[in-house]
């Protein structure tokens, strides 16, 4: 019987083999210079697929004596061929195979390999991996598959990862914030450290969702996981010091010096950083975060910090638990200055108009020492303690010099610079006839402020059932300020006067809370979470204010007459109790429903004394805020989030009092006793889809918002005195619809297309500028449509990178009651960024055309060609670099912004140092890895 089965099996095997199909890839490899066939070329085919189990198949082939090769591919999926030979540059070709579903013969044609500069030098040839692979629910990025140079830092690699972006030191994945870790541990400075570590130190980069502490202990997903970008650092790069130093010199005597040292360690990481510059950059570093922001339009910064952290493991604790404590003192000294130019068009009923022009030159000085500490650790396998401490002191000085002028018609019809010319406009001239008021003021303010914040939490895990926790939080702020000013007011209507003002202000703001929380799983599919928090808040505010219009009563530029209308004493006490009931229902491994219902009960009391207003206001309120979220997740490849929430917002109790603040006599703020609470509805649908085979990442978001009783600012204007009054008021409901699509795809090896489109439709209301608040106000419905499209197509190959891009924004405003103010605003920035690398040189060019249309300040409309270039020379194995930069070659850059409301339209402009030449030097200090 066995003798019969054996030949029968062989026959069946042959028949089955003949029935199989496969794609056949073939071609010829030649020398690009001599055009001669190359034999013995290594051809590595790496194929990846997507299914229930992710897989990668690698096969090696060799060209024959005539340069020919043949590769049979049995599986369906993306396939990457790498052609390499000693003395030649490697070439990579990406294709797709349909495997056994096809029997195509794919002719890849002629593949030409370019010889290296030293043809006979022996080189190491390594196989290329795909950029992205999947390992369960983890996205794995392979650094060796990206186009990188020796000495490149990790930030260069991160910018190439599909779906990952960096904003001010914070990393995002598909618009959601992610936390940076190294070997599963937090690192000081967050994403900022990416510019310091070499790519060669990274083995792999993993993107995954880190479970919450509750999920780790219960084994049930509670939907509160955090996106994590985990850089797997090679062991021989740990417990080493990495350093960075840079110096930059600009024209106009600007400079910047940076020093940074980091010790990567799984147990005791340390980071020290210092920054000295007058290029208008403020810096701050902390545990797992870093940020940089402009101080002002011009500025100086001196900043230094040292951060230390200790990590340890607890025997018996769940895998992946974190135990650490860190602290970091810092000192910052900042000076900022600049000038704002502002034009505001207030909308009146009919064809009437009111224009306000302002020029404000300001200077700021701050000294800010601070101390931060954070810790989280397990005392045993079931109890966790965490805290966060921040202590900060700020001492500052401010000076403002402001010039304002108000007109009853568009002043740009009568002068090119109406604000400056209004001071000397001759009597009877058109500009003088439409001038209603001019104000020149000088204000000096000195401040001192102390801030303390402390959070402490204890959690006890109830095995697989859940967690019980207690927490307390305290915030304390003590501030003191002194203000002195001089104001000169003139008007064609005969209202001319000088005013001196002085005030010293002190305040204490203290807030403490105690909370308890219970999260309990009834089974693996249903969890209930209950939180109760009791909060007490105390506010004391005192202001002694003096004002004189007669120089006789002014002593040393300080008035001596008390101004009771602006002297105040305020005491506010608040008791608030918040109860939150949350549930989580898991229908299966992919689908879950989360719901929350909050009940906030609070009692407020305010004792307020200001001028003739001496009152005690009390408010007792109960607020219910529900929220529902439906989540569907198919691993890392696809997800749906559908959410709805309802929120009630109470106006500040002070804003509901009939007070009047005339500290600025030309811009008076008032309260409104009839102010109602706001109610917000928000519906949102978010869908994410990842196609690793196509290197495609998609994100779609749809949302609808509805606001009941929205609060806006209403304005009243007296043309004879030039005084504006404003107070908060409710309007009819607002509506807004939003749609957003983010498309990010790698096209083969060298191309990448990224397009982010956003459209928003909104309808809101405001009140036209009135002349008397005692008269009925006129509503002005506003319909707005906004479309934004940010698209870039990047090409990277060998030493060339080209990126054409366009950033387009269109705003359409339609006012029902003041159609004269309808506008269509366009901002389009179209350009080309080019990076060319040759040996140790890198040339960067960014030339673009910034087009604006529809703005009131006519000089900002039209085309503005902008061009920046930069040349960098790398040396010392790419660890050091000299950079020469020329910014705004055509001297056409401007800083311009626009804000349109239902009651006004404001345009602002300010100057910065946008045109300069700079030279900088930077050096990376990398340790030598120990090969174990």
What are these regions (language model features)?
Residues 49-52, 56, 78-97:
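A short, solvent-exposed loop/turn motif at the edges and junctions
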Residues 44-48, 84-86, 103-147, 166-168, ...:
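Short, acidic, small-residue-rich periplasmic hinge/interaction motif at the N-terminus
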Residues 50-68:
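Short, acidic Ser/Thr/Gly-rich low-complexity loop/linker segments typical of extracellular
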Residues 28-39:
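Structural motif
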Residues 167-215, 228-233:
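Periplasmic plug
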Residues 70-78:
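Short Pro-Gly-centered beta-turn/loop motif in secreted/extracellular proteins
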Residues 138-160, 174, 181-187, 246-251, ...:
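Short, polar/charged loop or turn motifs at beta-strand boundaries
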Residues 53-54, 190-191, 211-253, 268-932:
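Primarily recognizes Gram-negative and organellar outer-membrane beta-barrels
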């Amino acid at each position: 019987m066995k003798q019969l089965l054996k030949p029968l099996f062989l026959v069946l095997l042959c028949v089955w083999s003949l029935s199989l199909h496969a794609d056949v890839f073939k071609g010829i490899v030649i020398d690009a210079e001599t055009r001669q066939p190359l034999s013995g070329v290594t051809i590595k085919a790496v194929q990846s697929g997507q299914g229930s189990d992710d897989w990668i198949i690698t096969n090696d082939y060799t060209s024959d004596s005539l340069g020919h090769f043949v590769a049979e591919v049995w599986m369906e999926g993306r396939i990457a061929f790498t052609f390499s030979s000693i003395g030649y540059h490697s070439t990579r070709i990406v294709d797709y195979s349909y495997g056994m579903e096809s029997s195509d013969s794919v002719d890849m044609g002629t593949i030409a390999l370019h010889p290296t500069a030293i043809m006979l030098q022996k080189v190491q040839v390594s196989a290329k991996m795909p950029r992205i692979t999947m390992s369960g629910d983890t996205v794995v990025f392979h650094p060796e598959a990206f186009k990188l140079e020796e000495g490149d830092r990790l930030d260069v690699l991160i910018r190439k990862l599909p779906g990952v972006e960096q904003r001010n030191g914070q990393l995002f994945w598909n618009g959601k914030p992610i936390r940076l870790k190294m070997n599963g541990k937090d690192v000081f400075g967050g994403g900022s450290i990416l510019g310091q570590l070499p790519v060669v130190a990274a083995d792999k980069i993993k993107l995954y969702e880190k479970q919450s502490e509750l999920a780790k202990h219960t084994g049930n997903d509670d939907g509160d996981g955090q996106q994590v970008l985990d850089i797997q650092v090679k062991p021989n790069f740990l417990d080493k010091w990495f350093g960075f130093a840079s110096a930059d010199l600009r024209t106009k005597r600007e400079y910047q010096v940076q020093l940074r040292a980091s010790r990567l360690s799984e147990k005791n990481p340390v980071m020290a950083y210092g920054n000295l510059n007058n290029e208008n950059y403020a810096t701050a570093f902390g545990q797992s975060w870093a940020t940089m922001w402009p101080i002002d339009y011009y500025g100086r910064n001196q900043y230094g910090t040292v951060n230390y952290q200790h990590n340890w493991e607890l025997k018996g604790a769940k895998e992946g638990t974190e135990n650490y404590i860190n602290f970091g003192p810092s000192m910052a000294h900042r000076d900022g200055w600049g000038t704002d130019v502002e034009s505001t068009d207030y909308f009146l009923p009919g064809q009437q108009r009111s224009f306000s022009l302002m020029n404000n030159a300001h200077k700021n000085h701050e000294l800010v020492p601070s101390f931060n500490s954070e810790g989280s650790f397990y005392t045993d396998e079931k109890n966790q303690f965490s805290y966060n401490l921040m202590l900060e002191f700020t001492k500052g000085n401010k000076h403002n010099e402001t010039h304002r002028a108000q007109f009853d018609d568009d002043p740009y019809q009568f002068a090119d610079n109406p604000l400056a010319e209004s001071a000397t406009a001759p009597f009877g001239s058109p500009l003088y006839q439409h001038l209603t008021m001019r104000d020149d003021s000088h204000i000096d303010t000195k401040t001192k402020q102390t801030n303390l914040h402390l959070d402490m939490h204890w959690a006890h895990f109830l095995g697989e059932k859940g967690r019980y926790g207690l927490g307390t939080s305290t915030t304390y702020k003590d501030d003191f300020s002194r203000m002195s000013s001089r104001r000169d007011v003139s008007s064609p209507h005969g209202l001319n006067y000088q005013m001196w003002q002085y005030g010293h202000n002190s305040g204490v703001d203290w807030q403490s809370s105690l909370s308890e929380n219970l999260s309990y799983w009834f089974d693996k599919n249903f969890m209930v979470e209950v939180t109760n928090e009791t909060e007490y808040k105390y506010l004391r505010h005192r202001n002694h204010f003096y004002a004189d219009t007669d120089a006789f009563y002014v002593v040393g530029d300080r008035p001596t007459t008390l101004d009771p209308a602006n002297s105040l004493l305020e005491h506010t006490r608040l008791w608030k109790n918040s109860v939150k009931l949350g549930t989580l229902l898991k229908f299966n491994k992919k689908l879950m429903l989360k719901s929350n219902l909050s009940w906030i009960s609070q009692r407020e009391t305010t004792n307020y004394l200001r001028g003739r207003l001496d009152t005690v206001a009390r408010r007792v309120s109960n607020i219910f805020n529900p929220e529902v979220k439906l989540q569907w997740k198919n691993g890392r490849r696809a997800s749906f989030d559908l959410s709805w929430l309802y929120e009630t917002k109470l106006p500040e109790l002070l804003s509901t009092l009939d007070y009047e603040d005339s500290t600025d006599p030309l811009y008076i703020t008032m309260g409104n006793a009839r102010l109602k609470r706001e109610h917000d509805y928000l519906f949102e649908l978010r869908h994410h889809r990842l196609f690793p085979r196509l290197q495609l990442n998609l994100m779609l978001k749809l949302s609808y918002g509805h606001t009941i009783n929205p609060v806006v600012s209403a304005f009243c204007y007296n043309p004879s005195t030039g005084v504006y009054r404003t107070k908060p008021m409710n309007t009819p409901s607002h509506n807004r619809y939003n749609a957003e699509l983010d498309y990010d795809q790698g096209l083969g090896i060298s191309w990448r297309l990224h397009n982010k489109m956003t459209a928003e439709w909104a309808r809101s209301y405001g009140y036209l500028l009135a002349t008397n608040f005692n008269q009925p106000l006129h509503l002005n419905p506003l319909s707005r449509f906004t479309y934004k499209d940010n698209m870039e197509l990047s090409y990277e190959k060998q030493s060339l990178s080209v990126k054409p891009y366009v950033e387009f924004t269109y705003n359409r405003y339609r006012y029902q009651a003041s159609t004269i103010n309808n506008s269509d605003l366009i901002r389009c920035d179209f350009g080309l960024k080019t990076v060319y690398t040759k040996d140790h040189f890198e040339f960067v060019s960014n030339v673009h055309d910034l087009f604006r249309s529809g703005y009131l300040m006519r000089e900002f409309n039209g085309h503005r060609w902008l061009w920046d270039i930069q040349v960098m020379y790398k040396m010392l194995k790419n660890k050091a670099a000299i950079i020469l930069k020329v910014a705004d070659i055509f001297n056409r850059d401007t800083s311009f912004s626009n804000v349109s409301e239902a009651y006004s339209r404001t345009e602002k402009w300010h100057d910065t140092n946008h045109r300069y030449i700079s030279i900088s030097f930077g050096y990376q200090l990398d340790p030598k890895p120990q090969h174990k």
